[in-house]
Amino acid sequence: MTNDVIALAQALIQRESVTPEDAGCQQMMNDRLQAVGFNIESLFFTDTLNTWARKGTQSPHFCFAGHTDVVPTGPEKNWQYPPFSGLVENGLLHGRGAADMKGSLAAMLVATERFVTKHPDHKGSISFLITSDEEGPFINGTTRVIDTLEARGEKIDMCLVGEPSSRDVLGDVVKNGRRGSLTGFLTVKGIQGHVAYPQLAQNPIHLTTPALTELSQTVWDHGNEYFPATSFQISNINGGTGAGNVIPGELEVQFNFRFSTEVTHTQLQQRVNAILQQHNLNYELSWIVNGQPFLTEHGPLVDATVKAIKSVTGLTTNLETTGGTSDGRFIAQTGAKVIELGPRNATIHKVDECVSTDDLIALCDIYEQILENLLT
């Protein structure tokens, strides 16, 4: 079974599943899950293939979640090894998706095969929620599957998302929550004119700069035991016609909050509007809530995971909520306990993405031990 983890990861990498394509990855997994007693349900929404596979109907219901889609490779000539080769060299498995997250998918599947073979009458239920829309707009993937499950009253109790959570060594970090993400799109109106006649124009860049300074210097909260303080970052500023002698008529600013559980997205929106109004700006502002913050505190899932990592690696893991968002946010909103555990993330989305074969083998052992801790 040890070599099987690597072989399966290679086979998945060799399928060019650039988001939202699945390229047959889910079928490969489904065939093996069905062989060990899982009921398979394929859910296709618009351009996205999703799989819901479940074995058992009882609680506790433990779910492995992940994605088969990968980000584009960029120019393949920049890669040391072809990005869809799945080549193993010097103890590293190379290819797009090796770390994010086809390696995790292989480890989940093989761990589950081992577990159900040893424990055909295990407690509770095991499921897999797999999508090909995590790296894309996340419209027709996990969120649609969750909607389907909720509509028929199917509840996940605990979920492990295989995102690459580890930092320096396998298992050193488990994400037991994530910050919320809120994006604002601001348009400030001015009056276009000639730069030599500023008295006849209103420069929206000049008008907006003090407000942006205040927003960037505002302390939104102080975080808490589990979350760092909420952060505000400006990501894009666009103004001007391209000509050097024209005062622009409007300014567009895009910004993002990564927010803790100490503040709500509504409170952030209200505070931003109050600041903009204090500066007497003529503006339009729209918002996208990309995800709400979630937190899984110590309990069966976290404790089983910490214990498994210690057993396999000898490490005492760190529980963190830093980093970006993941599909875990859609699952957590149902009340499920959610964590993220996967390989090291140093090469994700980069040229020459790779993962240690030893790490994948150990990750499979950790996943299997988590199942042992929870369902036997």
Swiss-Prot record:
Pathway: Amino-acid biosynthesis; L-lysine biosynthesis via DAP pathway; LL-2,6-diaminopimelate from (S)-tetrahydrodipicolinate (succinylase route): step 3/3. This is Succinyl-diaminopimelate desuccinylase. Keywords: Amino-acid biosynthesis, Cobalt, Diaminopimelate biosynthesis, Hydrolase, Lysine biosynthesis, Metal-binding, Zinc. Homodimer. Belongs to the peptidase M20A family. DapE subfamily. Zn(2+) 1 binds at residues 67, 100, 163. The keyword Zinc applies. The keyword Amino-acid biosynthesis applies. GO terms for molecular function: acetylornithine deacetylase activity; cobalt ion binding; succinyl-diaminopimelate desuccinylase activity; zinc ion binding. Binds 2 Zn(2+) or Co(2+) ions per subunit. Gene3D superfamilies: Zn peptidases. It comes from the Bacteria.
